[in-house]
A protein has these predicted regions:
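A cross-kingdom feature that marks ATP-driven nucleic-acid transaction machinery
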Residues: 1-105
Length: 105
């Protein structure tokens, strides 16, 4: 399952540097990044956004962003890239390889 592999890759990269939690209420968000005891970022990971999962993946990220008052969320995929607005908040959809390159800076 490529989605599971991508999630594990992302988890291993962020878990070494930051405190990480999982969010689950009505929906789920894969990773919440904590800095100074405050949630600073929400990250959702899926291999590919498609008709079957797009709403679920974006809704999970959006719910976490709303609950923790985050203005921006990150959705990492294998190759897709776009930006969209959800309830006035920005969701950045980015290939995981581009995100990995930014971690090195």
């Amino acid at each position: 399952d490529y989605g599971w592999l991508l999630e594990n890759l992302v988890f291993n990269c962020i878990n070494n540097k930051q405190e990480v939690f999982y969010y689950s209420e009505k929906t789920e968000c894969d990773f919440l990044i904590v800095k100074n005891k405050e949630i600073k970022q929400a990250i959702q990971v899926c291999h590919e956004l498609n008709e079957k999962n797009r709403e679920r993946e974006i809704e999970g990220l959006g719910e976490a962003m709303k609950k923790f008052k985050l203005r921006e969320g990150l959705l990492l995929t294998n190759s897709q890239e776009e930006e969209l607005k959800l309830d006035g908040k920005k969701i950045v959809i980015k290939p995981v390889w581009k995100w990995l390159l930014r971690l090195e800076k």
